[in-house]
Amino acid sequence: MSVPSWSKRLLNAVHGALIFRRRVESLADRLAIAIPSDAIRVLDLGCGDGQVAWALMQRRPELVIEGVDVLVRPETQIPVMAYDGATLPFADQYFDCVTIVDVLHHTDEPARVLAEAARVAAGSVVIK
């Protein structure tokens, strides 16, 4: 027996408003502490639609966050560039910090993703 479409919409709305939003806020709180205080330019690797980065910038307004993702959504909260999952389209040490949140388990080559993050980071790579 299938779930009626109205109940799916209701479930998605409740999940988005209560559970997902709380998760975004919690992640932003933790990242705001984990990112070094002298960082300005930050790359959110695997940023999705950029909600976590946007919430992070509310806590740390000095941060300028760009994102990359293998799937660029039609609407994003931050500037997002397409990423092939292998080579980041940035020069060495281009960012002060790179964040990787819930991404590595989706990759075929996590070591390569980490190496690329380290290459474009002048400072820290923050992984969750």
Briefly describe each language-model feature range.
Residues 1-10:
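N-terminal, positively charged/glycine-rich alpha-helical extensions of SAM-dependent methyltransferases
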Residues 19-38:
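Conserved alpha-helix/loop element of class I SAM-dependent methyltransferases that forms part
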Residues 41, 64, 94-96:
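Structural signature of beta-strand start/N-cap positions in the alpha/beta core
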Residues 43, 49-87:
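Class I SAM-dependent methyltransferase SAM/SAH-binding core
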Residues 99:
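A conserved beta-strand element that flanks and buttresses the S-adenosyl-L-methionine
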Residues 102-103:
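Short catalytic micro-motifs in class I SAM-dependent methyltransferases
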Residues 111-125:
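A short glycine-rich, Lys/Arg-flanked "PGG" loop and its adjoining helix->strand segment in the class I
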Residues 128:
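Alpha/beta-hydrolase-fold catalytic nucleophile elbow
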